[in-house]
Amino acid sequence: MSKGTIHRGRTLGRLRVRRAVTDPEHPRQRSTKGERTRERIIDAAGELFSRSGYRAVSLRDIAAHAGLTHAGVLHHFPNKEATLIHVLSRRDAIDAPLVLDVGPNHGALIDNLVRIVERNTRTPGLVSLYVNLSAEATDPAHPAHDYFFARYRILREHLVPTFAVLLEGRPNPTPEVAAQQFIALQDGLQVQWLLEPGAIDMRAAVVSFLRTLGITTSDPLPPPDERPG
């Protein structure tokens, strides 16, 4: 698959794997011991990748963090890249429908993206994971390069027509620029929030940016004295 080809399935990136057993939309009656072990490995990989990045972590590190032997991890995953694919795909099972399933409801897409920002404030490990991996993945040789390339392409493809409708009649910014600004704002806020979480209100900053464009959300900002932090 070429870099310009984007999956249209239930993922925001290029990676496809079987559905994780923790997908809340499709719960199972029970999980086998092997599935529970796989989830433990994915948890361990996600924690280590978020803390140290992908390249600084070995499969043996993941095994030790999961309380398993190296051979035990290899029984479930052939290599470190396979664990990365599952770590990224697990979250996409939750986030992708919020972006891909809204259809022509442009207001719903904006509301859902604001909800994702809000939810990210409760998952610092995940935010750290994406910040570290997206920076590393600018290298075309990185195993997550195509994933993040496609993720940004898909977000822009959905945001540009949304801003075209919501900004109708405004000469500036163009829908393309507004989409780029929105994504850049989210990414930059995440870095600042990781450095100084108590001083950064990511959701408030995103909603405020949208207001400067004349766009309101279904859940507006509370008065300043009622905001957290």
PLM feature spans:
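Amphipathic alpha-helical segments used for helix-helix packing
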Residues: 122-149
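Hydrophobic alpha-helical bundle segments that form small-molecule/ligand-binding pockets
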Residues: 141, 153-178, 185, 214-229
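Amphipathic, non-transmembrane alpha-helical scaffold segments
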Residues: 34, 42, 88, 145-156
